Curated annotation (Swiss-Prot):
ATP binds at G42, Y43, S44, G45, A46, G47, K48, S49. This is Methionine import ATP-binding protein MetN. Residues 8-250 form the ABC transporter domain. Keywords: Amino-acid transport, ATP-binding, Cell membrane, Membrane, Nucleotide-binding, Translocase, Transport. It catalyses: L-methionine(out) + ATP + H2O = L-methionine(in) + ADP + phosphate + H(+); D-methionine(out) + ATP + H2O = D-methionine(in) + ADP + phosphate + H(+). Belongs to the ABC transporter superfamily. Methionine importer (TC 3.A.1.24) family. Its EC number is 7.4.2.11. The gene is metN. The keyword Coiled coil does not apply. It is a peripheral membrane protein. The keyword Transit peptide does not apply. One of its GO terms (cellular component) is plasma membrane. PANTHER family: AMINO ACID IMPORT ATP-BINDING PROTEIN (PTHR43166), METHIONINE IMPORT ATP-BINDING PROTEIN METN (PTHR43166:SF30).
Length: 354
């Protein structure tokens, strides 16, 4: 089992502005394991960016304890490391941002090399390191191009190479795909996954998009008004969200609400027969492999008209979502519902026939 490389315990962050006291983060505890791709999701003002400054050791918490890679860095608002040790810890954490933060007057390779200016490597070693980093992010052929000559995705690749220059153990992505189109976003996420696997890099994804979490993360924390309201494996959170905000994020990411709006306009749903019901079926893991609808027809003579279906892979596990009209004798439908539950399927009745 991997150990936590980042431990935030009971973190409070309070700001004083004139006569106002702003509680930006309230009693947040998060443990991120080595090798995780960990998502922190929330709307603007949730406290995500403030929490980032705590994780990358730029912001001391008002209260609470921070441990990074086994070393306590802050405890009850006080620095626990020497200035030099704290600088070294910060070098263990790379950052990428929404707007890339590249220097316009420097080429791609010069932007990456800039991150090595305090390195103990020789000039030749630095030059070789830059070549290797640009190759790692798939941008070798653009080494001599300036940012103005690069696409958004290429700029972000340069930024990733720069963030990796000092061999960090942790990479923080602060809304790094928000300015990119969907296709480029997928390419950057695929690159981050590859770096996670190849380098054993721990990645923290700060985002307001649950789609990003769904595509890349293995664990997620949901924040609202400075409070962590829900946390756990992505599969568990998507399969069984507890909080209303989490459910809202998930329905946006899966598109189920939009599907339901269209389904409710269909004649079969508007005029649902008395011996039928509209149901949503959610299932994960091995239950996605079972021919469940065929099974309930054979066993209970209950037919299933599939109006919507979707299967996705979350953290390497298939997760399915389906909206169906089940039709048959009332007692048979009840028996079919029970059989589905026993097979690990979550059944939600959306509408019963009149």
């Amino acid at each position: 089992m991997n150990e936590a490389i980042i431990q935030l315990d009971h973190i409070d962050i309070t700001f004083h502005q004139k006569k106002r006291v702003i509680e930006a983060v309230k009693d947040v505890t998060v443990h991120i394991n080595q090798g995780d791709i960990y998502g922190i999701v929330g709307y603007s003002g949730a406290g995500k960016s403030t929490l980032v400054r705590v994780i990358n050791l730029l912001q001391a918490p008002t209260n609470g304890k921070i441990t990074v890679d086994g070393d306590v860095t802050f405890d009850q608002g006080k620095i626990q490391l020497s200035a030099e040790a704290l600088r070294q810890k910060r070098r263990d954490i790379g950052m990428i941002f929404q707007h890339f933060n590249l220097m316009a007057q420097k080429t791609a390779k010069e932007n990456v090399a800039f991150a090595l200016r305090h390195s103990s490597l020789s000039k030749t070693e630095k030059e070789q390191k830059v070549i290797e980093l640009l190759e790692l992010v798939g941008l070798s052929e653009r080494a001599d191009n300036y940012p103005a000559q690069l696409s958004g995705g290429q700029k972000q690749r340069v930024a990733i190479a720069r963030a990796l220059a000092n061999d960090p153990k942790i990479l923080i992505s602060d809304e790094a795909t928000s300015a990119l189109d969907p296709k480029t976003t997928k390419q950057i996420l695929a690159l981050l996954q590859e770096l996670n696997r190849k380098l054993g890099l721990t990645i923290v994804m700060i985002t307001h998009e649950m789609q990003i979490v769904k595509d890349i993360c293995n664990r997620v924390a949901v924040m609202q008004n400075g409070v962590l309201i829900e946390e756990g494996p992505v599969l568990d959170i998507f399969s069984n969200p507890k909080e209303a905000l989490t459910q809202e994020f998930i329905t946006t990411a899966t598109g189920i609400d939009e599907a339901l709006e269209k389904i409710n306009q269909q004649d079969i749903v508007k005029h649902l027969p008395a011996n039928a019901l509209l149901a949503q079926l959610k299932y994960a893991g091995t239950s996605t492999d079972e021919p469940l609808l065929n099974s309930i027809y054979r066993q209970f003579e209950v037919t299933a008209n599939i109006l919507y279906g979707n299967i996705e892979i979350l953290d390497h596990i298939p997760v399915g979502d389906m909206i169906v009209v089940l039709e048959g004798q009332a007692e048979n439908i009840l028996a079919a519902e029970k059989a589905l539950h026993e097979a690990g399927v979550d059944v939600s009745i959306l509408k019963r026939g009149a």
